[in-house]
């Protein structure tokens, strides 16, 4: 079935085929971008092909399930993702985040290792708070942030809380510090909250209030920033934690409270580990980061850390680590090597997903052949290339078609040479 495209056909496009018109239309959405930004990680991916890097996806899902079912040991999990540039590591991080949040399986923090720091616990903490303040699931109409969801779930757990008390906690403009102290005491009387940080529970209860001023001070307190007396007034005079060791303690306390509230993992998606080599003292930075994540997962059993980096970088730097740290990184969850070269079948799925998105955005029905205007024979020319190279080649092809105003055969001469064997 064919329908009229939402965008008017470009007068320079000579084909009467509506799908070719869409493909060649310079005003149509871009579908072959090979770059994923940190902001993209927080949105659904209409182009995701779940069969690509299937082993890594299955491993990740198994680790998440083991944490939820309480089948891990007394410490958290570390999963290494190794691959060459352009193999799809950041794309996979995005898929992991969407997998977890679309199924309400936990809370993810995403970060790239691009900043110099002497305290990686603080770096992780700042990125965690940034992540918790983002919308939890952008695939639904719910606009709640992760932090708002957690505070609401914590309030739901308060024993014998009346609806009137709940509404007062949400919207009353007076001082609720005494009430929050009482609610926190009720919570810590429950077995699941008995070991949680009492002051952190109170902070999460303050976060439930419908007051942006309170929300701002909660975020500052969670980041272990110093607070003025005026700031502390909004959060029940809570004492800020500003010692050098406090960020790591805060990370562990937040993970523990998340586990008590919803019995789900706190997941750190740490990307582009190889960027540490661009900083001063790169070997020392690498060691500090590994020390931080191993200590965190040792102390917080519901944490999962996914490390993605270039395989060459990791192989060159792993020898700088003591055996005890290597064992934590590589056991019991063995590193996953991401295959960078795509098969013809995978390439066809990549193209199908992107063409389908294009046609749906322009109000077109689906063509009989979901690869149209491509043929599988044309796409075979891109076999054994990296995902990034394939998308760049397709983007250049579409741009030429737009300039010509017609569909051009997929060009064999435009294929970059395949990467050397590993």
Go through each PLM region and give its residues.
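Short secondary-structure boundary/capping segments
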Residues: 125-128, 320-325, 408
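A short, basic N-terminal segment
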Residues: 1-77, 159, 170-171, 407-411, ...
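The catalytic "switch" region of P-loop NTPases
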Residues: 2-32, 214-374
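Phosphate/oxyanion-binding active-site loops and adjacent basic polyanion-contact surfaces
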Residues: 45-60, 88-89, 117-125, 242-250, ...
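Conserved AAA+ ATPase small/helical "lid" subdomain
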Residues: 142-187, 333-412
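P-loop NTPase nucleotide-binding core
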Residues: 72-263
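Alpha-helical scaffold elements adjacent to nucleotide-binding pockets in ATP/GTP-utilizing enzyme cores
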Residues: 59, 63, 92-99, 120-131, ...
